[in-house]
Design a protein with these regions (language model features):
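Alpha/beta-hydrolase-fold catalytic nucleophile elbow
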Residues: 24-27, 50, 81-82
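Catalytic histidine neighborhood in serine/cysteine hydrolases
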Residues: 70-87
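A conserved short beta-strand
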Residues: 1-2, 12-28
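Short, conserved loop/helix-junction motifs that constitute active-site signature segments
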Residues: 17-18, 38-44, 70-73
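Short beta-strand/loop motif that positions the catalytic acidic residue
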Residues: 43, 49-51
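Alpha/beta-hydrolase-fold serine-hydrolase catalytic core, especially in secreted/extracellular enzymes
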Residues: 83-84, 91-151
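Acidic catalytic loop of the alpha/beta-hydrolase fold
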Residues: 30-32, 54-58, 86
């Protein structure tokens, strides 16, 4: 039901704002985002796509792994959260603890700010996600290489 409602909302949404250079999408129905009928040609941002390995609402394959493997090598990243599902990747409501995704999201945003104008997608774009320092002590996070997603 949520994905069906999302289709109507996203078809009216303009994702081509040239001011946006990097975005984070957690467990999105990527097939809708990558659909050329909704403005893929106008997407000017690098994408950090995060998916839980046990997400039954938006399964990582075909919603994340397949589309990521087919995407151009423009500096996008796919991070899989081992054991993550659609509901345990967010910060616990009312608790002072942070989400398991806070470090990786912060690293991505910091990388985008540090890259400045060169943060835009492209084959020679600088890496926005450092090789380490963004993991979680409670859940394994894996940066999946494009080549591995193509399998």
């Amino acid at each position: 039901v949520l994905q069906c409602s999302f289709v109507n909302a996203i078809s009216d949404f303009n994702m081509s704002d040239p001011r946006v250079k990097a975005i984070v999408a957690v467990s999105p129905p990527i097939g809708l985002i990558a659909d050329p009928r909704i403005g893929q040609d106008g997407l000017h941002a690098r994408i950090l796509l995060i998916s839980g390995s046990h997400d039954f609402v938006v399964p990582p394959d075909p919603e994340a792994i397949g589309p990521f493997g087919m995407a151009p090598a423009d500096g996008h990243h796919l991070v899989l959260a081992k054991g993550g599902d659609h509901f345990n990747l967010r910060a616990p409501k009312g608790e002072k603890s942070v989400s398991v995704l806070s470090p990786v999201i912060l690293a991505w945003v910091n990388g985008a700010f540090a890259a400045g104008p060169s943060a835009a997608p492209g084959p020679n774009a600088p890496d926005l996600l450092p090789a380490k320092g963004w993991g979680s002590p409670t859940m394994v996070l894996v940066d999946v290489p494009r080549e591995q997603a193509n399998r």
